From Swiss-Prot:
Family: Belongs to the glycosyl hydrolase 51 family.
Organism taxonomic ancestry: Bacteria, Bacillati, Bacillota, Bacilli, Bacillales
Subcellular location: Cytoplasm
Protein name as it appears in the record: Intracellular exo-alpha-L-arabinofuranosidase 2
SMART domains: Alpha-L-AF_C
């Protein structure tokens, strides 16, 4: 008998995996927007109306469902009117003390979303803004015609209003968004959200600024005071192997201890979702309010020689395992977790893409998103996994995790992670209810070294490969996983 056992009920769905779990986040931070996404129409780098063509095409492959902007901490010092029409510069006080040109504003962001065919998720300014400013931004974007803001939008080149589905009322108002107490922010949220009105057939999904990590009191206060006025409540949690203030650890030069600690801290998101979810259930037993994990991912020390305020870090196979582990946990909580936005899309923190001048590379995290996109809006299949332990220095974690989903046409996708940096894993999976698969295939992302990563000189060092180390006999699936690996198995429906 294999050391790892699992049962997948191929005909029992536990819920739907909201595609928005695979959302993204792009902040005016470092080279995340400028140089990363936006190069301007005068750039020698190929672009579409100022947006980098290579980055755009790569992001399209991910089927990004939703993109959060302009922050982050930047959102609570962003004054949207400076980014339309005649642009006004400002100081980005949060991230590197740089001058923000506001060249990339509302029109450019909405154009990006249209090109990506994704929903915009805009975060409004509560920390330093006003109710009127937020109200006028909504009017500018979504009112058809005949008002000062809608007429200004038309003067600036956009005739038709945009569709705006998601709007966040402030960001991290417990910290960079104003250092508020939850009671104070709850009252502000109630006030500000009143003026996030629905125009032109819009039905805006309002997201309240939620807790940092394990601040369960914040969640309790917000749900008690404002649950009926919100559609979603956010949660922020970063995977940091070290200490946030004293040293987070290197993205590439790390020890075996740090590998294990990183995996352990990644798994902590499961406990956080359960505990915040239990509080939300107290005030929202029908689970109408979504838990929106709109900032998550690894956070390491910046790369040496870069501006520390730019949060530029490399991305290894370790990051890939962190991403895959998060997705498996998000899937299991798909009733409550309705959106998640990794930080961030390009050149910042756990990025999909890194750029350097004209050059671009895809990170191991990008490849996980690309492999896992098959789970978007699919039915989560009931799965029970009996994993052997991944042991390190007297501590243990489950060595493997498995998630399975079924698409509308009947194809079944199974993703498996082996987080052990040293040991392979052999798993035996019973596929109950499976009669026959017309075809099957496998893809694997792995590496020989735990700090393996892509560079501009070797951009394909870590990439997905065809995977054949498995057998399927009737309804028995046997899989051999190397250390540090993420596998996707697809069983195509017999038509």
């Amino acid at each position: 008998m294999s050391e790892h056992q699992a049962v997948i009920q191929t005909d029992i769905a536990k819920g739907t995996i909201n595609k928005n779990i695979y959302g993204h986040f792009a902040e005016h931070l470092g080279r995340g927007i400028y140089e990363g996404i936006w190069v301007g129409t005068d750039s020698d780098i190929p672009n579409i109306n100022g947006i980098r063509k290579d980055v755009l095409e790569a992001l399209k492959q991910l089927h990004i469902p939703v993109l959060r902007w302009p922050g982050g901490c930047f959102a609570d010092e962003y004054h949207w009117a400076n980014g339309v029409g005649d642009r006004k510069t400002m100081l980005n006080t949060h991230w590197g003390g740089t001058i923000e040109s506001n060249e990339f504003g509302t029109h450019e962001f909405m154009m990006l979303c249209e090109l990506l065919e994704c929903e915009p998720y805009i975060c409004g300014n509560v920390g330093s803004g006003t109710v009127q400013e937020m109200s006028e931004w909504i009017e500018y974007m979504t009112f058809e015609e005949g008002t000062p803001m809608s007429d200004w939008r038309k003067q600036n080149g956009r005739e038709e209003p945009w569709k705006l589905k998601y709007f966040g009322v402030g960001n991290e108002n417990w910290g960079c968004g104003g250092n508020m107490h939850p009671e104070y922010y709850a009252d502000l949220y109630r006030r500000f959200q009143t003026y996030v009105r629905n125009y032109s057939g819009n039905d805006i999904y309002k997201i309240a600024g939620g807790a940092n990590v394990d601040d369960f009191n914040w969640t309790d206060v917000l749900m008690k005071k404002a649950a009926g006025l919100m559609d979603g409540l956010s949660l922020h949690y970063y995977t940091i192997p070290g200490d946030f203030w004293k040293g987070k650890g290197s993205a590439t030069e790390f020890t075996e201890d740090e590998w294990f600690i990183t995996m352990k801290k990644a798994k902590y998101i499961d406990e956080l979702i359960q505990k915040h979810g239990t509080i939300m259930d107290r005030y929202d037993p029908e689970q109408r309010v979504g838990l929106i994990i709109d900032e998550w991912g690894t956070w390491f020390d910046p790369e040496p020689g870069t501006n520390p305020g730019f949060l530029y870090q490399q991305n290894t196979i370790r990051d890939a395992l962190v991403a895959a582990s998060h997705f498996h946990i998000f899937h299991q909580h798909c009733r409550r977790v309705q959106m998640a936005n990794i930080a961030q899309t390009v050149n910042v923190l756990q990025a999909m893409i890194l750029t350097e001048g004209e050059r671009m590379l895809l990170t191991p995290t990008y490849h996980v998103f690309n492999m896992f996109k098959v789970h978007q809006d699919a039915s989560l299949l009931a799965t029970e996994t009996m994993s052997a332990d991944y042991e390190w220095n007297g501590e243990t974690l489950p060595q493997i995790s498995i998630s399975a989903s079924k698409q509308a046409e009947g194809d079944i996708n199974i993703t498996i992670c082996n987080i052990d940096h040293q040991n392979k894993a052999e798993a035996e999976i019973e596929l109950r209810g499976l009669h026959k698969a017309a075809d099957h295939s496998g893809v694997i992302l792995t590496a020989e070294k735990m700090n393996a990563h892509n560079t501009f000189d070797d951009p394909h060092h870590v990439k997905p490969e065809s995977f054949r180390q498995y057998t399927l006999s009737k309804n028995k699936l046997k899989v051999k996983l190397p250390p540090m690996s993420v596998v996707l198995l697809t069983l195509r429906a017999d038509s």
